[in-house]
Amino acid sequence: MSFLSGFFGPICEIEVVLNDADTRKVSEIKTEEGKVEKHFLFYDGESVAGKVNIVFRQPGKRLEHQGIRIEFVGQIELFNDKSNTHEFVNLVKELALPGELTQSRNYDFEFMQVEKPYESYIGANVRLRYFLKVTIVRRLTDLVKEYDLIVHQLATYPDVNNSIKMEVGIEDCLHIEFEYNKSKYHLKDVIVGKIYFLLVRIKIQHMELQLIKKEITGIGPSTTTETETVAKYEIMDGAPVKGESIPIRLFLAGYDPTPTMRDVNKKFSVRYFLNLVLVDEEDRRYFKQQEIILWRKAPEKIRKRTNFHQRFEPQEPQASAEEPEI
């Protein structure tokens, strides 16, 4: 697989071909428009190497330039402030000194053991992307083309992964106990738990478990929170009775969530909550949120050959009181 730039007028095309393009895995990412793009997948510490091909399609053409370079860029862009993009990685390789091209040329490049500290992410209000940027410098207008890559951050099994157990209720009306088997789940995991009814004096019509994603961008008064319901799991439809216990099994693999991201470069965070929702016969809704951590488990081949490590944030998941609660 190669990246193809398209035409720069009638003069030339630019191609970027990775050295391991035949064997490197491709991953998908959903854009802000909802389209799915496929790009080569990299991990933190991996080198990025290949060739830049400047291809003349018509003989006899000439291209004067002030130099040719390639950059490896990691960038955060806030959609509500597109003029203020932040580059947290920028590595440059000069491919050619100023001169003139009269025929097709190719240039080798290699960025050794590149630090890629964050996961690629496209959300409601922010995008974190990695890309190769080829620039042919000219007197008037540079020829520039960008080629996106995808980066996944891998994590080891957490040293501590306590279950979540909590009793909640409305005084003299409803008292329930809920339990989830873990507080940290990998992206293909299964959330297992149970709901136990200790006291039921209101008529519950419906109960469901939601996986809520909260994307927080900005700092201080300019903070924006975007909330999305990633998954819904119907626990019961009908009235429970005292002493009843209802099991929970929510398969994360079917919903393709991202890992939890905390304070990424002081620009944004992505947090996940389990939201227990009860609806009574008068259509009143009761909520209880509990934060969980989602992490990306390394594939078996990567675990065997790579000494990777992602530290989990020291903060334990917390219950949320941002909505009306039980």
Swiss-Prot record:
The keyword Cytoplasm applies. GO terms for biological process: intracellular protein transport. InterPro entries: Arrestin-like_C (IPR014752), Vps26-related (IPR028934). It is a peripheral membrane protein. It holds the Pfam family Vps26. Keywords: Cytoplasm, Endosome, Membrane, Protein transport, Transport. Its main location: cytoplasm. GO terms for cellular component: early endosome; endosome; endosome membrane; vesicle. It is found in: Cytoplasm; Endosome membrane; Early endosome. The keyword Transport applies. Component of the heterotrimeric retromer cargo-selective complex (CSC) which is believed to associate with variable sorting nexins to form functionally distinct retromer complex variants. PANTHER family: VACUOLAR PROTEIN SORTING 26 RELATED. Belongs to the VPS26 family. Acts as a component of the retromer cargo-selective complex (CSC). The CSC is believed to be the core functional component of retromer or respective retromer complex variants acting to prevent missorting of selected transmembrane cargo proteins into the lysosomal degradation pathway. Retromer mediates retrograde transport of cargo proteins from endosomes to the trans-Golgi network (TGN). This is Vacuolar protein sorting-associated protein 26A. It comes from Xenopus tropicalis (Western clawed frog). The lineage of its organism: Eukaryota, Metazoa, Chordata, Craniata, Vertebrata.
